[in-house]
Amino acid sequence: MRLSVRRVLLAAGCALVLVLAVQLGQQVLECRAVLAGLRSPRGAMRPEQEELVMVGTNHVEYRYGKAMPLIFVGGVPRSGTTLMRAMLDAHPEVRCGEETRIIPRVLAMRQAWSKSGREKLRLDEAGVTDEVLDAAMQAFILEVIAKHGEPARVLCNKDPFTLKSSVYLSRLFPNSKFLLMVRDGRASVHSMITRKVTIAGFDLSSYRDCLTKWNKAIEVMYAQCMEVGKEKCLPVYYEQLVLHPRRSLKLILDFLGIAWSDAVLHHEDLIGKPGGVSLSKIERSTDQVIKPVNLEALSKWTGHIPGDVVRDMAQIAPMLAQLGYDPYANPPNYGNPDPFVINNTQRVLKGDYKTPANLKGYFQVNQNSTSSHLGSS
């Protein structure tokens, strides 16, 4: 009996020693970590150097970081940004997804903090320096882009007004590239007015006001694009993308360093399919990009702009001429379409396309009026 008691006491003692040893080991490791942190200079922990790791449905692991070649698609709303991102989304290696809406707002806030001398002083005094803010912006933007859709080898973001911050974004993501969608401002404004696309600061009851605001917005974006440089920012003319999709998309994919895929010419066939094109049920362009690329949206603005605005067009929107559009031509000669596009237009006129099942009930595609409401914008 005594022997049994001794064995029990011995076993208990060994267990106690083992627990104490484990706890001591943990404390040693924690102390080393603390000491290492004290010896490191301030800011040695760099979250912007960390990677996001995601696993796709194909069980492939994707790693995303600040050095990745992100693609940013933007431009004044109603300039073809949705069509462009749908075409890219059709590529098997690319995922753009719907507008996040939040990224341009956060970028605008960041810009406001920088412009306000008093606010910047307060932030600096609190230790919230430009370096801290930039690291936080970098992590936030990457997190939103990466996690608001399925993982892919190449990620892109389409929020139209992000390209007002191209220079800043190119600093946060040094290997990023930008596609600036450019469209005849008269067509963009007619589209936003007739489709009642609310944009902050635009008076949708006035063509003159909207064209003035269009001019200001595209002027800022174009200047940012030029400052970033032609190696990183490519102006993409909506009219040429629609008239000559194969030629335009080859130039775009070459610029982005992405291999060619015929899928980009048939985005409408991949809508709502796994790994294909995901469309928002509430974005204004959704009911248009379900159709193949077609022609009539190019010039359906003709005859709708008030006469006094037409007369003053060169003064109201000087960026038209700078971008290569004739402000006095109504409409300009944008060029001759490829046979492929003519065939697509005939398909649309016949109603030879289907609304994806997941989008039915959220908008109506009136096939009886397609002859006057064609196009993807």
Curated annotation (Swiss-Prot):
Its EC number is 2.8.2.20. GO terms for cellular component: endoplasmic reticulum; Golgi apparatus; Golgi lumen; Golgi membrane; trans-Golgi network. The chain crosses the membrane at residues 9-25. Residues 101-105 are annotated as: Interaction with peptide substrate. Widely expressed. Catalyzes the O-sulfation of tyrosine residues within acidic motifs of polypeptides, using 3'-phosphoadenylyl sulfate (PAPS) as cosubstrate. Homodimer. Can also form heterodimers with TPST1. This is Protein-tyrosine sulfotransferase 2. It comes from Homo sapiens. The lineage of its organism: Eukaryota, Metazoa, Chordata, Craniata, Vertebrata.
